[in-house]
A protein has these predicted regions:
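Condensing-enzyme catalytic core mediating Claisen C-C bond formation in acyl metabolism
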Residues: 1-52, 150-214, 219-222, 252, ...
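Conserved beta-ketoacyl condensing-enzyme motif
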Residues: 17, 51-110, 226-241
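Short, well-ordered amphipathic alpha-helical segments that serve as non-catalytic structural scaffolds
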Residues: 55-71, 119, 204-219, 285-290
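Acidic, glycine-rich active-site loops and adjacent beta-strand->loop/helix elements
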Residues: 83-88, 110-111, 136-142, 188-189, ...
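Active-site-adjacent elements of ketosynthase-type condensing enzymes
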Residues: 84-100, 134, 140-153, 239-241, ...
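Short glycine/threonine-rich loop-to-helix capping motif typified by GTGT followed
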Residues: 93-96, 235-250, 314-321
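Active-site-proximal alpha-helical scaffold in enzymes
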Residues: 106-134, 173, 277-298
Length: 342
């Protein structure tokens, strides 16, 4: 069972990520991280009749590949925790329909992967699940249609805008065994510093990431330099700079910060402006880039902070400000699972 210190839940016997998988689309196949995806599609429709159906197919393929890599089947999964950006999380719901698994849909916007890992770790630690799938996805075309403008409109993108990844990532969690351990989880609190620009999600989300990291460090009495990497979800280039500035104002100079949204694409070569975004962005970078490094013991302790902007199409049209949240998961290489200060 987990123990609580402030807002942070610590697992004396860390649940493990027994297997993971990530699949991307055409732009991801042209990215610097292309070789780290398990599979890539040159057709972003994935042979489906609509973009929305394509995203469902992306989740289905990723979930099944994750189970295959674990030599498991749907019968070995107690619960599916999944989410996406579509209204009412329809990509996840339709994928759950096809998988036939017990399903709890989650929505934390682009923070959903960390949310799913955190909730899943709690359930595994409490003995409520023997095998649990945590999964998120996003699709550039579904997100553009829902939150911005139709693709055929040809709107000019601002320098602060980010490119929603067409990608999905899935992790199979187990209460114990071989795999990267989840040692601690900090569920974030909603932050809102008054940003209204839907084309500057990084600025809206940076305060949430800073607040959650500061709370975790206080709860666990740790320092940033104790970790090989502090990895945010999709702040992008603009949001990452603001994140570091906010922490510098609190006396913390981060030298080990990386951002999934900054890593995924070549900002200039792929014309993505401030970087990548979407629940599939951090899920894919986690499953294809971060977890393998921990498994190879190239890194030993990593903080994974996914961030999400909690607005909707309606609140944007009503000119509301953009609230944001960030959830943190501490990941440890297999031999580090029961060590450290936490």
């Amino acid at each position: 069972m987990a123990t609580r210190r402030g807002d942070t839940l610590i697992f004396p016997k860390p649940p493990v990520i027994a297997a993971h998988a990530c699949i991307g689309g055409k732009k991801e196949g042209e990215s610097p991280l292309a070789a780290e995806f398990d599979e890539l599609h040159s057709d972003n429709r994935l042979g489906q009749a609509s973009w929305e159906a394509a995203e469902t197919q992306l989740q289905l393929q990723t979930a099944r590949l994750c189970l295959k890599k674990a030599h498991a089947t749907e019968k070995d999964v107690s619960l599916l925790l999944a989410g996406d950006l579509q209204a009412q999380c329809t990509a996840s719901g339709y994928a759950a329909r096809a998988l036939g698994l017990p399903f709890a849909g989650l929505f934390g916007a682009c923070s959903t992967m960390a949310e799913a890992l955190g909730v899943g770790a709690c359930l595994c630690s409490a003995g409520m699940a023997d095998g649990l799938l945590a999964m998120t996805s996003s699709h550039f075309c579904t997100a553009e249609r829902q939150f911005r403008t139709p693709l055929s409109y040809g709107a000019v993108r601002t320098p602060t805008a980010q490119w929603t990844a067409t990608a999905a990532g899935a992790c199979l969690l187990r209460p114990a065994g071989q795999g990267v351990g989840i040692r601690a989880v900090t569920f974030g609190r909603v932050q809102d510093l008054g940003i209204r620009d839907i084309n500057n999600m990084g600025a809206a989300m940076a305060p949430a990431a800073a607040a959650t990291l500061l709370r975790y460090l206080t709860d666990t009495n740790t320092q940033p330099q104790e970790f090989d990497a502090i990895c945010t979800g999709d702040l992008g280039h603009v949001g990452s700079q603001l994140f570091r500035e906010l922490l510098a104002a609190e006396g913390l100079l981060l030298k080990n910060h990386v951002d999934c949204g900054s890593l995924l694409y070549d900002a200039e070569g792929q014309s993505v402006h401030s970087g990548a975004s979407g629940p599939g962005c951090c899920a894919a970078v986690l499953c294809g880039h971060l977890l393998p490094r921990l498994e190879r013991r190239g890194q030993h302790r990593v903080l994974f902070l996914a961030t999400g902007a909690l607005m909707s199409q309606t609140t944007f049209l009503q000119k509301e400000t953009i609230p944001a949240i960030s959830h943190l998961v501490e990941l440890a290489a297999p031999e580090e699972q029961n060590g450290g200060n936490t």
